[in-house]
Amino acid sequence: MKIVFAGTPEFAAQAVRAIHAAGHEIVLAFTQPDRRAGRGMHLQASPVKEFALQKNIPILQPETLRRTSADPQKKAQAEEAYKSLSAIEFDAMVVVAYGLILPQEILDITEKPGRHGSFNIHASLLPRWRGAAPIQRAIEAGDAKTGVCIMQMDAGLDTGDTVLVVELDIARDETSASLHDRLAGLGADLIVNALDVLQQGKTMIRSPQAIKGITYAEKILKSEAEIDWTLSAQEIDQRIRAFNPFPGASSKLNGYAIKLWNSRLADSQAFSMVGGAGDVLEFGRDGAYIQCGEGVLEVLEMQKPGGKKMAAKACIQPIGAGEKLLHFQLKE
């Protein structure tokens, strides 16, 4: 089939690679404009754009798809996108972590007679965790399960009917990085399955989302990553794993900011000394045991400013037990 693809990060790139490998023709790729990133702040293409360039797929990078924009440049980009999509022959549109809302007039083009509409890969069990950061929010909340939904898109925020749903257990030591990779692979497989069903002329059953259980996965802010040690050990552990790799949980040690990358719950009954929230109680083989508002957390991996990730014991032990990890304010 001929597919229009819209996506930006690596999660989306896995899907477009799988669609291409399955023999479908990507006739047009939408992706976000190049962004400055890295230490040199050089312009970098998105993973989806890099793939499209390799395969000579036409690319559009509008800043908005809304032709009503008051910004003349953005409005012109949206006009170009609308005209290009209207002129091209395609069977379906696939949208994965694109970063722009598709207005109804764009969806209408994909739903013209002979076309199958627009499909989205969403990394949660809808209607739980609609929105921008479903992977991180699921771990932060301590969810035991998540999954992937293939959704027939409508104009709402992740409100469309689901056509395929697969559940996945969240491992006890899961980070957003590891869960991202598992869900990206699952999503890529599912969208290929969905397109194969459509190509065979079969009808996929559309299931409206439940009215109950709706939650929203708001975009992750850097300020959320600062650890408040008066929280319970379980809450802090979930945050450390949720914010790995971005933005990285943060605390303050001996006057400088550090990143916390990995942790696990400890048996608080095993410690003879009890400190205040944020106190370093003692050291294990690799980790440092930190008193929390409730319970004890073993922090396993840290990173000093400008340094590499290292075992927390190696990071803190030169300072000694009794040091305090502090809550501090990060700027956005």
Swiss-Prot record:
Keyword Transferase: yes
Gene Ontology cellular component list: cytosol
Top class in the EC scheme: transferase
Entry-linked PROSITE patterns: GART
Record carries keyword Protein biosynthesis: yes
Keywords for this protein: Protein biosynthesis, Transferase
UniProt cross-references to InterPro entries, sorted A to Z: Fmt, Formyl_trans_C, Formyl_trans_C_sf, Formyl_transf_N, Formyl_transf_N_sf, Formyl_transferase-like_C_sf, GART_AS, Met-tRNA-FMT_C
Gene Ontology terms for molecular function: methionyl-tRNA formyltransferase activity
Catalytic activity, reaction form: L-methionyl-tRNA(fMet) + (6R)-10-formyltetrahydrofolate = N-formyl-L-methionyl-tRNA(fMet) + (6S)-5,6,7,8-tetrahydrofolate + H(+)
EC number: 2.1.2.9
Stored SUPFAM superfamilies: FMT C-terminal domain-like, Formyltransferase
Positions that bind (6S)-5,6,7,8-tetrahydrofolate: S124, L125, L126, P127
Lineage top rank: taxon: Bacteria
NCBIfam families membership: fmt
Function description: Attaches a formyl group to the free amino group of methionyl-tRNA(fMet). The formyl group appears to play a dual role in the initiator identity of N-formylmethionyl-tRNA by promoting its recognition by IF2 and preventing the misappropriation of this tRNA by the elongation apparatus.
Annotated PANTHER family: METHIONYL-TRNA FORMYLTRANSFERASE, METHIONYL-TRNA FORMYLTRANSFERASE, MITOCHONDRIAL
Family from the record: Belongs to the Fmt family.
Protein name as catalogued: Methionyl-tRNA formyltransferase
UniProt organism field: Polynucleobacter necessarius subsp. necessarius (strain STIR1)
